[in-house]
């Protein structure tokens, strides 16, 4: 591998096709520590344990220099310096160091102190596009004065009003109901209306607003398809509210075989530990794409193996870059940093072994870093 190839990977601008806002407001160390754990959706019993992880080690190795500290600084000194700079300055430094030209932001999950898309564009000095989360849109609608009996037309109209200002739609079906449902056809209007009525009754009786009805979620998916929106589906690893065995993308086979699903790009997000299954689906279906974003940060140095596996079966025109970062902007930076490290190491080895030419490697880097996302989402 030549130094010029390593420099090429370092300089390539990325399109992060699935990400969330960074924090813009200061808070305490416990918020920061809890943000470094994906699996536990509650508050950590020992927040400092978050530092004793692949992500914690990667953060102290790669992010320390961005805030003027030596590599591998202690967690105590890292937090002290971070507090001196403040959250907004951290977000500015980290997002700009990531080398991302376009952030495609899922605005459907928000926490206190998080930057909105306009704030992200300003702080990162980059272009921002919005991804609409279908379940959040439905939850907004069901809490309105809209008669649930008219849910079909109301949701269709609401999503259609968003279509001109977003570049895609995202579903968290994996979290809410799992993939083990028949999604191959749009549900009947009467079934949708009945499910909406039951949902409203549950809320009025003091139940949760959280949408977990597979009929309504499936209806949302097919609405997005009918509008021609690229469809993002969270796959695999997430917090403990998700049943991992029901988040295997192979359970989507009947859906992907359907005529309806073939009409739009279907993007399998993150996929760990099902990246090989996702790679098979990307090879098997013309309209299926994947990334391995979320797990990259959490695997730290071991993400090199994950990223290498993503290049086994999937055509290189079907792999995209994402970080799925949310909250601390270190995650927005680390996603890019660890991806560049892995690509340089993995592709570099293939070049050195004369399995790949450097010209081919450069071309694939550009495909995954940005060109595939440009094509799928119709970005300028």
Model-assigned labels for residue ranges:
Residues 30-124, 130, 152-164:
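Alpha-helical scaffold segments that flank or form the walls of functional sites
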Residues 20, 108, 133-139, 172-176, ...:
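Active-site beta-loop-alpha junctions enriched in small/polar residues
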Residues 93-97, 115-130, 157-166, 223-226, ...:
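Acidic (Asp/Glu)-rich catalytic clusters
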Residues 13-26, 230-236:
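Histidine-centered catalytic micro-motifs
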Residues 164-276:
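Divalent metal-binding pocket/active-site signature
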Residues 1-17, 29, 33-69, 73-81, ...:
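Mid-to-C-terminal alpha-helical segments outside catalytic/metal-binding sites
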Residues 254-256, 262-380:
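H/E-rich (His + Asp/Glu) clusters that bind or coordinate divalent metals
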Residues 18, 103, 169, 234, ...:
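Divalent metal-coordination and catalytic microenvironments
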């Amino acid at each position: 591998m030549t130094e010029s190839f390593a420099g090429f990977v370092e300089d390539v601008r990325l399109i992060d096709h699935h990400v969330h806002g960074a924090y813009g407001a200061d808070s305490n160390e416990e918020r920061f520590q809890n943000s470094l754990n994906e699996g536990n959706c509650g508050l950590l019993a020992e927040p400092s344990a978050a530092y004793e992880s692949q992500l914690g080690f990667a953060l102290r190795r790669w992010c320390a220099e961005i805030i003027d500290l030596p590599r591998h600084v202690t967690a105590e000194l890292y937090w002290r310096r971070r507090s001196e700079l403040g959250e907004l300055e951290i977000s500015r430094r980290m997002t700009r160091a990531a080398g991302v030209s376009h952030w495609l932001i899922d605005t459907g999950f928000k926490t206190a102190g998080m930057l909105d898309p306009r704030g992200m564009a300003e702080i990162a000095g980059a272009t921002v596009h919005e991804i609409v989360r279908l379940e959040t849109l439905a939850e907004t609608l069901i809490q309105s004065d809209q008669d649930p009996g008219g849910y079909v037309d109301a949701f269709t109209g609401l999503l259609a009003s968003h279509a001109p200002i977003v570049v895609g739609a995202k579903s968290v079906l994996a979290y809410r109901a799992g993939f083990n449902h028949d999604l191959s056809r749009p549900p009947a209007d009467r079934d949708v209306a009945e499910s909406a009525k039951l949902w409203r009754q549950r809320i009025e009786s003091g139940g949760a607003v959280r949408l977990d009805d597979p009929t309504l979620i499936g209806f949302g998916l097919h609405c997005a398809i009918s509008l021609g929106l690229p469809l993002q589906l969270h796959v695999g690893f997430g917090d403990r509210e998700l049943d991992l065995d029901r988040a295997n993308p192979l359970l989507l086979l009947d859906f992907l075989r359907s005529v309806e699903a073939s009409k739009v790009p279907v993007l399998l997000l993150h996929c760990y530990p099902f990246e090989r299954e996702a790679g098979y689906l990307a090879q098997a279906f013309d309209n299926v794409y994947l990334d391995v974003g979320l797990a990259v940060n959490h695997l730290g140095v071991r993400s090199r193996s994950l990223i290498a596996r993503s290049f086994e079966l999937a055509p290189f025109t079907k792999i995209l870059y994402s970080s799925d970062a949310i909250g601390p902007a270190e995650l927005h930076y680390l996603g890019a940093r660890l991806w560049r490290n892995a690509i340089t190491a993995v592709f570099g080895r293939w070049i050195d072994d004369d399995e790949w030419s450097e010209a081919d490697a450069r071309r694939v880097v550009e495909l995954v870093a940005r060109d595939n996302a440009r094509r799928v989402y119709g970005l300028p």
